[in-house]
Amino acid sequence: MPLLDSFKVDHTKMNAPAVRIAKTMCTPKGDNITVFDLRFCIPNKEILSPKGIHTLEHLFAGFMRDHLNGDSIEIIDISPMGCRTGFYMSLIGTPNEQEVSEAWLASMQDVLGVQDQASIPELNIYQCGSYTEHSLEDAHEIAKNVIARGIGVNKNEDLSLDNSLLK
């Protein structure tokens, strides 16, 4: 089985909240695809609650599109990490970490503006595979934490995992 890029970085050196360009690629037609690691929590020290990350998934995907999509950028997908320490965002385009950070921060402000559970998009049995597994309160706490701590940048060259540790 191939070793994925996300497992070639030293998680003990990651800062959070922080943006990292996880991968860049160019399609055969010449479109640039960028994958960002949006790290909300310090790996192995903090974790997002299941209900909080699920609610944030519903809110964050739309808010990030509101703040980042444009003529040269289109978000393909924003998905929570299985380890529950952040999200991966794949997009067409090449925004820099600062642009992504600003959109992320604005999105967290938007999350705080959601006043009740009924305002969470797609929160119903037809559009959500686990529609009872949500907490707006937890999502608000996550957003407050990101805003209070600020968003940094994780650089791949600073996180390179020594080959002796690769398994």
Curated annotation (Swiss-Prot):
Cited Gene3D superfamilies: S-ribosylhomocysteinase (LuxS)
Enzyme Commission number: 4.4.1.21
Alphabetical list of Pfam families matching this protein: LuxS (PF02664)
Keywords per UniProt: Autoinducer synthesis, Iron, Lyase, Metal-binding, Quorum sensing
GO MF annotation list: iron ion binding; S-ribosylhomocysteine lyase activity
Entry-linked InterPro entries: LuxS_sf, Metalloenz_LuxS/M16, S-ribosylhomocysteinase
Positions of Fe cation binding: 54, 58, 128
GO biological process: quorum sensing
Cofactors: Fe cation
Reactions the enzyme catalyzes: S-(5-deoxy-D-ribos-5-yl)-L-homocysteine = (S)-4,5-dihydroxypentane-2,3-dione + L-homocysteine
Free-text cofactor note: Binds 1 Fe cation per subunit.
HAMAP family the UniProt entry points to: LuxS (MF_00091)
Role this protein plays: Involved in the synthesis of autoinducer 2 (AI-2) which is secreted by bacteria and is used to communicate both the cell density and the metabolic potential of the environment. The regulation of gene expression in response to changes in cell density is called quorum sensing. Catalyzes the transformation of S-ribosylhomocysteine (RHC) to homocysteine (HC) and 4,5-dihydroxy-2,3-pentadione (DPD).
Subunit note: Homodimer.
Family statement drawn from the similarity comment of this UniProt entry: Belongs to the LuxS family.
Protein known as: S-ribosylhomocysteine lyase
Species in which this protein is naturally found: Haemophilus influenzae (strain 86-028NP)
Name of the coding gene: luxS
